[in-house]
Amino acid sequence: MQAPVVFMNASQERTTGRQAQISNITAAKAVADVIRTCLGPKAMLKMLLDPMGGLVLTNDGHAILREIDVAHPAAKSMLELSRTQDEEVGDGTTTVIILAGEILAQCAPYLIEKNIHPVIIIQALKKALTDALEVIKQVSKPVDVENDAAMKKLIQASIGTKYVIHWSEKMCELALDAVKTVRKDLGQTVEGEPNFEIDIKRYVRVEKIPGGDVLDSRVLKGVLLNKDVVHPKMSRHIENPRVVLLDCPLEYKKGESQTNIEIEKEEDWNRILQIEEEQVQLMCEQILAVRPTLVITEKGVSDLAQHYLLKGGCSVLRRVKKSDNNRIARVTGATIVNRVEDLKESDVGTNCGLFKVEMIGDEYFSFLDNCKEPKACTIMLRGGSKDILNEIDRNLQDAMAVARNVMLSPSLSPGGGATEMAVSVKLAEKAKQLEGIQQWPYQAVADAMECIPRTLIQNAGGDPIRLLSQLRAKHAQGNFTTGIDGDKGKIVDMVSYGIWEPEVIKQQSVKTAIESACLLLRVDDIVSGVRKQE
């Protein structure tokens, strides 16, 4: 008898077959259970200490998972889910994780006890996905993007589950205002639908300033910089400034390579210094030729240049971030110039109404405000402490993402678990028409969809068993808009209760959840390399 050949490294752990699948499903469930209490308006907060000793207080699914350190590969893939959801649509991160975990949990018995091949389960899940998206489409309704009241209600539904609910009115205004500001009309698409570009990441800047009250926050029709003018004598208040944006240093240009100069006479030395000064003077004269009243550069400004520009009646800001400079260009209509020699009259921005420097707390901030038709903006957030501001910032990002999604595809689904319940009831009906073993995993998706309304009831402290059967009965009669009031844990009609969510978010969360479940079911071998213990 030949000795067994060991080809795997002994220090590696390896799980195969059923064992691997069970371990994956357990890990996915564990992640889902951590997040489960963070769904709905009565959500709990999680308090996390990151390795640096910083504190994170949040109930945003994505923010929590980002901070948790996970070892299991399946759990890591769950974290990726919430990230995808966050980048794609910005909201619904918690829903995705709970759904994916629940679908896997519902499929587990068929996989382990009934020994159904994973591929058959996956086929059924894919079929369920197509049908589920169909149902979501049926229960959704179009929305008028220009109707501010309706839009605010919508954003409120997204914010309602977050920490900022105390100031939800204010936050809705901020988010809607900001998104409307950066909305850029690109004409019409091929199908003749309106086409917008809304880039929140690049053109909406959130400046968090501790102190003051949250209600003091506002959207600036312009840009706010944490800078002061470079010279104390420069004007700190300019109405209708003429803005010049530069991407070059205003100091003496040194050659790229090293140069040696031999000096014979003493006057030559003075001449060299003079040339340096003349060069700086020439640069400043070229700038002042277009009569600017505000010069902003991404690089440094030498003392001499400050002196000349001050004499020319010009305020200067230096070392501004590239991203900020782009925003200033969008709001003032100026063009960023890389060489002073190339400055033209058309590069000067005149759309800004007011430049002023204010002291907030103990720092100076420069405002470029009251711009005409700005295509970028800054949200100035005030609040008690840094932790509160960070949480408000996260929630505001979600709210803006919601507003953006609706503008890009104006269609709404009922919230409060109503959409999920409708999908669940419809899938359960269809499962009865399927033949063979496929109907079990198909039914599993239907059962899994119920976990969203169930979790909402549990988080609000209601009785899940009684309420769920009532809800199921309502949906079976065709009331698709019936869902859970997450505050009181009662059954309400979403039309009168007024909680609607963008259809994109619902579709994306179902897609992501089912596809990730399929992915994890396909795995039948996990090899984790263990580092050699020192």
From Swiss-Prot:
It is found in: Cytoplasm. The keyword Transport does not apply. One of its GO terms (biological process) is protein folding. GO terms for cellular component: chaperonin-containing T-complex. GO terms for molecular function: ATP binding; ATP hydrolysis activity; ATP-dependent protein folding chaperone; unfolded protein binding. SUPFAM superfamilies: GroEL apical domain-like, GroEL equatorial domain-like, GroEL-intermediate domain like. Keywords: Acetylation, ATP-binding, Chaperone, Cytoplasm, Disulfide bond, Nucleotide-binding, Phosphoprotein. Disulfide bonds join C371-C377. The modification N-acetylmethionine is found at M1. Pfam families: Cpn60_TCP1 (PF00118). The modification Phosphoserine is found at S257. Molecular chaperone; assists the folding of proteins upon ATP hydrolysis. Known to play a role, in vitro, in the folding of actin and tubulin. In yeast may play a role in mitotic spindle formation. Heterooligomeric complex of about 850 to 900 kDa that forms two stacked rings, 12 to 16 nm in diameter. Belongs to the TCP-1 chaperonin family. This is T-complex protein 1 subunit gamma. It comes from Saccharomyces cerevisiae (strain ATCC 204508 / S288c).
